[in-house]
Amino acid sequence: MPGALGVLTWNVAGRLSRLDEQADRVLAHDAGVVCLQEVIPNALARWTQRLERAGYAVAASAVAPGAPRVHRLGVLIAARHPPQVVAGSAPAPWPERLLAADVQPPGWPRALRVVCLHAPLSQSADQAKVRTLEAVYAALAELGDDVPAILCGDLNTPQYEDRDGTLQTFAQTRSGRLRAGRGERHDRAERAIATGPPGWRDAFRALHGYEARDRSWKLGRHPGYRLDHVLVSPALTPVACRYDHGVREDGLSDHSAMCATIALSCSTT
């Protein structure tokens, strides 16, 4: 499809020992935009080197020196044309987990807003997950419908998806009751980010519906969750979307990579 753009998002699990294997697998997809999560500080230089050598320009979130491990998990955006970082795009409480940048795909009349997010876990202190999801949702909702934009990353939601499209969040028990200490605000924040603002679409569900059952995170005997997503704004059409489970099955991460192809909607071309 003319003007179509490949996007890859992957939580690389802060791995160092297998970084070169991870990079080989990322580069094999030849995506126009790459979004990575859990890039630790002492891995960033190697990731940057591998990506730049392959013709990408890289932008990465800032991680404070000496930060505890939970705050050492950064994110990066790589693209064939230099990403222009959008400062202060959303007031996230853990800023190292969020990065927004404008990327100019070849032949597109305007830049693509790329938001790369690694949401904190539900049990994080100070409602970090809820505040992060609310801030990102608000920033996306402020964009006009004609703005091509994507949200990529490990959103750490939902807990479960029914075949009728009903979501169960991590604010709920498996029986559907709200968990003590999480409540309705947590539930609303997860539900909102899982589908995006009005007109936004989950690329995977838009193409495969809710009949498709898949998991992007698995560890040991745990049945896993579908935590890794690409959401697209009304100005975009998802053309293809699938998970690369091979990277997880080969032990390169506890997450599968998501590979999507997007294009400008007819009304914006």
Segment roles from a protein language model:
Residues 4-14, 110-121, 152:
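Active-site-proximal beta-strand elements of phosphoester/diester hydrolases
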Residues 39-120:
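Structured beta-strand-rich core segments of catalytic domains in phosphoester-bond hydrolases
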Residues 1-54, 67-72, 266-269:
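N-terminal, active-site-proximal structural segment of metallo-dependent hydrolase catalytic domains
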